[in-house]
A protein has these predicted regions:
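Short, charge-rich amphipathic interface segments used for partner binding and complex assembly
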Residues: 23-71
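N-terminal acidic leader/helix
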Residues: 2-36
């Protein structure tokens, strides 16, 4: 059966995709933190990179929030 494409379906798919992206960014930030602990010499760079990942996550959350508020 073919699923009818509606505005509501599209919004739900966007929400699901954004949630998946946020989950992936969380995992990436955690992984970078763990790598930093293993390689203390590179810890400063890892912390900077982890901060960038967290900033990207914040932007993703803002985008999702904006989409939800626009409904």
């Amino acid at each position: 059966m073919i699923e009818e494409f509606t505005h509501t379906n599209a919004q739900e798919r966007v929400r699901e995709d954004m949630a998946s992206a946020i989950t992936a960014l969380d995992f990436l930030a955690t992984s970078i933190g763990r790598l930093a602990a293993l390689h203390e010499a590179d810890e400063e760079d890892a912390i900077i990179t982890e901060g960038r990942v967290i900033a990207a996550k914040r932007e993703m959350v803002k985008a999702v929030t904006g989409l939800l508020e626009a409904e």
